[in-house]
A protein has these predicted regions:
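Class I S-adenosyl-L-methionine
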Residues: 1-126
């Protein structure tokens, strides 16, 4: 929601400390990852990382140069990631399209079953 608003406002710089990683965790449908996903703590960490990566890919597809940064010492908080995106008007259309393709591929990989969750994630990329 926050990133969608930042995109709608055409923000030049976006700094986000992401939360709300539960959506992918509840919808994960990827048999290749069952060996990891059967352990709830590892499943959550996998979904956290995948969600943040997809958020960065989505921002890249809108013309932003993106990075995931360590926010503070990991001993202070379990989720210490900050997503940084800086709009780059010089980013080529081809680079934006590649980022969009990578975003869609990630959604389809993690959410195999055709359903509401996959459509929700894909709609964010449009």
């Amino acid at each position: 929601l926050v990133l969608a608003r930042a995109l709608a406002w055409q923000s030049e710089v976006i700094l986000s400390t992401p939360c709300c990683h539960h959506e992918l965790n509840h919808a994960l449908d990827c048999p290749e990852l069952d060996g990891i996903a059967e352990y709830s703590m590892l499943r959550q960490k996998l979904c956290d990382a995948a969600t943040d990566a997809m958020r960065l890919m989505l921002l890249s597809s809108h013309g932003y140069r993106t990075e995931a940064l360590e926010l503070i010492d990991p001993e202070e908080t379990p989720k210490n990631i900050m997503l940084r995106a800086v709009y780059d008007p010089r980013m080529s259309r081809a680079a934006r399209e590649r980022a969009h393709e990578r975003y869609e591929a990630a959604v389809r990989f993690f959410l195999r079953s055709e359903g509401a969750a996959q459509e929700t994630f894909l709609a964010r990329g449009r």
